[in-house]
Amino acid sequence: QVLSAGELEALRQMQLATVEELPEVSRSDQTQHRLRHLEALRAAGMEPYPLGGSLGSTSAPVLGVKDALRIFSSENIPDSEFIVSGRIRALRNHGGVLFATLIEGGETLQVVIERSLVGERPLSLASCNLDTGDIITVQGSYGASRNDTDSLIATSWHMASKSLHPIPFDSFTDPEARLRRRSTDLLVHPDQMQNLRLRTAVIKALRARLDAEGFLEVETPILHTVHGGASARPFRTYINAYGEDLTLRIAPELYLKRLVVGGSGPVYELGRDFRNEGADATHNPEFTVLEAYRPYADYVQMRELTERLIKDAAQAVFGSVSLPLGRKASSERVVRDVSGPWRVVSVCDALSEALGRRVDVQTDFEELLALAQQHGVRVHEGMGPGAIVEELYGELVEAHTVEPTFYTDFPAETSPLAAPHRSVPGLAERWDLVINGMEMGCAYSELADPLVQRERLTEQSLKAASGDLEAMEVDEDFLYALETGMPPTGGLGLGVD
C-alpha cells in the first residue's frame, strides 16, 4: 500500500514520539556524571570535541607530554610559552589552584591551573567539569611547583576531547577485558604500543632485504573463486555484482606463481590471509604473511634467504642479531645471540632422535599407529603414514624446539604444492622454521610439473568432496598457467605477526 504524504508525516511523528518515550540508553553513573560536565562546557561556550587547528591565532606547534618533558629537562629552557596536549591521569583541586597530571606513554607532566593566571571563569570550568581521561590542550610556560616539580604553568586551557568513560589506570588486568577494549588496554599499558613499533620495524627490515635482493613487491586478489594455496578452512562470502560464491584467500601462492610464469622474476607480497579455524595464542583468523618466490632457486636458497630476513629484522628491533628465546611465557624469555648458522635437521632424523628409534615414512603403518596412540597423537580416517609422521613431529619435536631450527624434508603426503625430494622417495623438498616451539615459516622447492600438480590437486578435491573442509580445490586457471611452463622456483612463507 502506498501512503500519502500526510500519512507518511503522521507515521514519522508517531515514530519520533515512540523514540522519545524509550528509556535512555543504560549508562553508568560515571558516564552520566561526565555527560553533565560535557553539557556544562558546551553551555559555557567551550566545545568538548573541537576540530584540529582551532587553537586561535597561535601558530606554535602542539607538543605531546614526552616532547614537553624533553624540553623541560634541557639545560636551556626557552622563556617562551608552550602549547602542550595530553590526557588527564589525575586531578587535585586546592581551591584557587588546580593540579592536573597529563600522561603519555607512561610519562607524566604536571600542569598548574591557577586563578591569578587564567582567571576565575576558566579555573571554575576546569575545576567543575574536567575528569580523568579527558584530553586537554594547555598554553603556558615552564615553572616549578612548591615541591619543586617541573610543571607547565597554564595561562589558558581548552578541551581537546571529553572522555565519557573512566579509564581504569590501576586495575585493568583481566586478559579478556584487555582484548575486548584494545584502546583502553593501550592507554593503561603503553608498553603494548611498543609492539606496533616493533612490527613496523620488522616489516621495514623485511622489505629492505627483499628489495635489495631484486624482488618485486606486488598485490594479488584477496577474494578468490577457488580456494587453494594451503590446506585450511576458508571464510566464504558472496559477490552480488557477479552472483558468485567467493572465499577470502587462505594464501596468495597460486596467484604469485602465475606472476612467475608470466615472467615477473623474483616476487613477493606482504598481505593479510584469512583462515576460518580455531584461534589461540599462536593462531589468529586473520594474519599477515610474507610470501616470496625466486625463479631458479630451491628450498636451500630460500632457507638461506629466510635466515637473512629474520636476522635483519632482529637487528632492526634489538640492535643486534638476537632473539628472545625460551620455553616459558614470552615475558620470561631471554634475549640471546643468534648470529651464528642456524641448525638444519630432517624431520625424520629429529623425530627418530625424540623417539629413540628410527622412524620415517617407510615405517610400518601399524607401528606408526601404535606410536601415535602411545604419545597421545590423534589419528583420523584417511591419514597415511606421512600424515602420522608429521603429527608425531609436531607433538614431539616442534613443540620442544627453542633455538632457531630448520626442519627439512617433510612427507610428500602432507606437502601437495612442494616438489618431490630429488633423492629420497616419499619426501618433499620443504622445510619449516621453528623458534620457541612455534612454526615461524616454511619454504618449498616448488612443484613445477603440471601433470603431478593436477594429480595432487585432484586428490585434494576428492578429500574436499568427502567432507574435508581444509582440502584444496582444483584451480584450472592456475593449472593452465603451470602447463604454460613455470621455471624451477623456490618459494617461502613467513608469518609476520
Show where each model-derived region lies.
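Class II aminoacyl-tRNA synthetase catalytic cores and aaRS-like
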Residues: 1-497
